[in-house]
Regions:
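Generic structural signal for well-ordered alpha-helices
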Residues: 2-6, 31, 35-36, 80-83, ...
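Short beta-strand/loop segments at the ligand-binding rim of alpha/beta enzyme cores
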Residues: 11-26, 88-98
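Hydrophobic faces of well-ordered beta-strands that scaffold small-molecule active sites
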Residues: 18-22, 46-48, 95-100, 119-121, ...
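Glycine-rich phosphate-binding active-site loops on the catalytic face of alpha/beta enzymes
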Residues: 45-55, 101-102, 108-135
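C-terminal helical cap(s) of enzyme catalytic domains, especially alpha/beta-barrels
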Residues: 56-72, 125-149
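C-terminal extensions of enzymes
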Residues: 112-113, 119, 128-147, 154-182
């Protein structure tokens, strides 16, 4: 199906990026399969991860056992673990968007260090408002400087200890993957 979507996109002459979004409830085998398909088909990136159906035992309140997707802080640890695994499996060759439980600069930095090129906010943005974006941006700049990085790109995947060959992104390539495929 992905190959056909890419063909249709390419036939239209409108190079809209195609990203695959995955849930944190994947098994290791499913994660491996999806990463391999993403690399083979040439998707433009992955969004890791979506809401979870799991309910951690520490949830409190009247909605603790509510059916449906769970998002926000309880999703941070499993989604960050899946992000790190996806980064390892794709060997840094696909841009990854880290999602799930990000509510601070420290959370965003953890996602970046696990392999995210970008981060996505939702739940925390709803509760904290648009000022949260500036707080995270400022805090992230401080964390990067503290650790000797001059850009987010330098910190991507650093927790993995992987030495990948990265190519600097040019403005004309903004919608294309930043890593060499091969």
């Amino acid at each position: 199906m992905l190959k056909r979507l890419i063909e249709v996109r390419d036939e239209t002459g409108c190079p809209v990026p195609l990203l695959v979004k995955v849930a944190p409830d994947l098994t290791s085998e499913e994660c491996t399969d999806i990463a391999q398909v993403a690399l083979e088909t040439g998707v433009d990136g992955m969004i890791v991860s979506n809401t979870t159906l799991a309910r951690p035992s520490g949830l409190i309140g009247r909605h603790a056992h509510q059916a449906g997707g769970l998002s926000g802080p309880p999703l941070f640890a499993p989604s960050t673990a899946l992000l790190a695994e996806t980064y390892r499996l794709t060997r840094g060759r696909l841009p990854l968007i880290g999602v799930g439980g990000i509510s601070s600069a420290e959370d965003a930095y953890a996602k970046i260090r696990a392999g995210a090129n970008l981060v996505q906010l939702y739940t925390a943005l709803v509760f904290a408002g648009p000022g949260l974006v500036g707080q995270i941006k400022s805090g992230l700049a401080s964390l990067l400087a503290r650790d000797g990085f001059s850009s987010v790109a330098e910190a991507v995947g650093i927790s993995q200890g992987a030495a990948l060959v990265r190519q600097p992104i040019k403005p004309s390539q903004a919608a294309t993957p930043r890593y060499t495929r091969g």
